[in-house]
Every structure is written in structure tokens, then in C-alpha cells.
């Protein structure tokens, strides 16, 4: 019988961190299971090529169901199926979130998750190019750097925002988040620095770490309500492995709830309808899905704006309030890039520039459920984008602000025709229709195994799944509410904090008995 102290399911943004930290103790054995491949696809390394990874072998390439509030469109949701998970296919933007996000998590009944509590974990993982400070760390595994060769239009975007009265903010992860600046990136020596590159590849030779790729976990194994192991498929065969300590589920906001439900943890009605025996009645599994969404404003350019090979495309940004409540976190984040990023129906050949208003705290909530009892079927994803009218209105407000920026003097020498939404789309009604027609994901799904103490919570503040022993969820799915900005950095922080929580309660090993299939 094969046994490890810990089994980690998913070598993604959090899973790689947990694997690194738990194996720092040479006596602790860890099995890391990843459904995807090693991260050796060359486009992973090249920052500019991240969109070329979509719908390839390193992408789960999920689609939502038809979304009723956005003209029944199905939204394509790329997710990393590779060592490093989505940190190997994302746009590499390092945004931690707003301090209010984490203070709110604590206020929702999650002690230990306030901004002051989590800041040390952000700093621990970081090797900040600018050096150490009150807010930043050096010597950590993850390289955080300034853009190497930002486009002149990205600089102009910041200048235009400052001229409009927004503050110049060189550090969105520092004293304040509001304002305009260039994004810092998880790049090292001009190449993507995923969590696989930062936390996993340097330690692959640790004798107490076993990493298995192309391993699809099919279910968790229980004795009563104690988690004793996992079952997975590898090279066409079914394997069972067992744990002395804990199973750590780090499969992401779509696949962590999917695996819990396949294993009998979730809404009894849903599980019984699919013939899955119920282990724990936990109705919150797969609920509370939140994501950032955006609708672009795109211009043709009057001159060639080819971004550098080290560009992540979304080079500059602006965090702002469309409402008067300045005590709240910014409700809109703008991304700017020196490319003609337009919806397919609006796309034009040639050079351009674009900006998207991203809704930081959508009111709409979605869900993840099972399509069948087969682990090979993709989950049923319903985002419910723009169910709330206020979400539409905020995106329209964001489009209007971008138009002001693009019509400023800073863009005079570059401004060509507006191709999306188009210069004739001016009324609020027309802009609202445009938003419903084109709004798209910013690839930040979270919240489907939320942390908390209310009846819909899935994990407690130490990330332990309610109703069973020896099982934690450690990834973006535990966020009670989505953070303000890109979600990769807070997911890495969750991995760092979880590793300490796990180490603090390591217990005397118990012998697990074999479960027959």
C-alpha cells in the first residue's frame, strides 16, 4: 500500500507553494498530483505568447453554459492544465488585492485573514526587484519585476490618467491601490515566472517529494468521515494512494468543487440525482462563484505599436471609483495594452491599442455543478454575468472613462478609428447593449468552496472542509469574496498561509486501511 504524509491535488498557483513548504521538512513525504503536463511548452516562457496557449494541451478550455443575461453566449474559460496551473498561462500581473478585501474576509468570521495577517505571507513569497520595504519582500521564491520595455502608449495611458486627476501610483501593492501605473509582473530574466518555475522546479529533486503529471484524480477516499487517500487515473490505470496526515485539494475554482461533489461532498439533492453516495451534506460546494468581467474599448493606431516580446500585453492599469464611496475598495480596474484587443465581431487587422474596464466586485453570483458522475466530464459552469443591472451600469461608466483617456492629448499622435464599441455607440442604452453583447471573463474565477462560518461555507478559517477530517481546500475557491484585481498573487498567498496552518497541526501518523474499489 502506497502512503504519503500528504497528497496535494493540483500543481497550480497554490499547490506548488504548498508542496514546496511541506517538503522543507525532510521527514515529511508529499505526493503532488497534476492532471496536466510538465511546463515545457516554449510559449509558456515567452510573456507575449500567453494567448497562444489557449485551447492547447495546457488548457482545460472550459466553456460556461449559455449565459442568459449576455445574449445566451457561452463564455470560454481558459484554465491551466500544466505544472504551475493558471500561473503558467496567465498575463503575469502581480496584484495582491485591496487591504479592505482581507479585512472584510476577517469580518465575515475568518480570524487570521485580515490584511495585517496576510501581508507577511505576500512578502514571504516575493523577491521584489525594487527591494524590501514595509510592503515588499526580497529573497522569496517568486520574482516580481517592473516591465522591461513597456510601450510608449502604456506610458501615455498613465500620463492621460494623471492629467484627468487620478493619482500616479507606481505600486498598486503598496500604501494605496487607487491610481494609474504600470503593472508589476511575475517575470524573471525576461521569462514567465510561474509558481512551477518559482516553487516547484528548484525542489523537484527533494527525495521526500513525488510529482506525478498526467494524473487525473477521480475521487477522494474516506473511512467514515476521515479522508484516507485518493484515487486517480494515470497511463490508463486506476491507482489508489493513502495519507497519514491530510489531503490538500488545490484544483482551482472549477475543479476543486467538482472533485468534492464526485466524492460525495455537496448538496444531497444534486449528488443523489447523479447516483453519488452522500458523505457530507454541504450545500455551499460549487456555489458563490465570482469572476471579474470586462468589455473593451479598442482603437486602431496611426503607427506601428508592436509590443516587445517581454510584454504581457496588459502593461498599464488604473484602479478607480465610479461611486462616491472612497472608503470602499475601487470598483473598476482598467487594463491597457498596445494591441488592438477587440471582440471578434469588431476585430480589424493592423496595429492598435485598447483598454478594458474590469468590474472588481460584481453583484452577480454563479455556480459550478456536475454534468455527470464521470470525472472525465467537464463541470457545468454558470457565471450569471450581468444578472445585476448595477454591474452593467458600472461597466458603461468604465467605458466612458476610457474614452476620455483615449480622447486626451496624450493619445493625439496614436489615435486612429475607434473600432469597439465604435464612435456611433454613444447613448447609455447602446453602451449597455454593447456590454451585454461582448463582456467577457478576465479569467479570475473564485469562491466556490468559500471560507466562513455560515451555512453555505465549505471550509473553516483553517481551510478544513466541514464534516470530514483530514481534508483541506487550498486555492482561489476558498475566497469568500473576490479580491480587487488579479487573483494570482492572493492565491499564492493562500498557499503560503495554508502551509503554515497545515504544519501547525501535523499529528502522529495513523495507519489507513485499504479501501476496495
What is the predicted function of each stretch?
Residues 1-517:
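N-terminal redox-cofactor-binding region of secreted/periplasmic oxidoreductases
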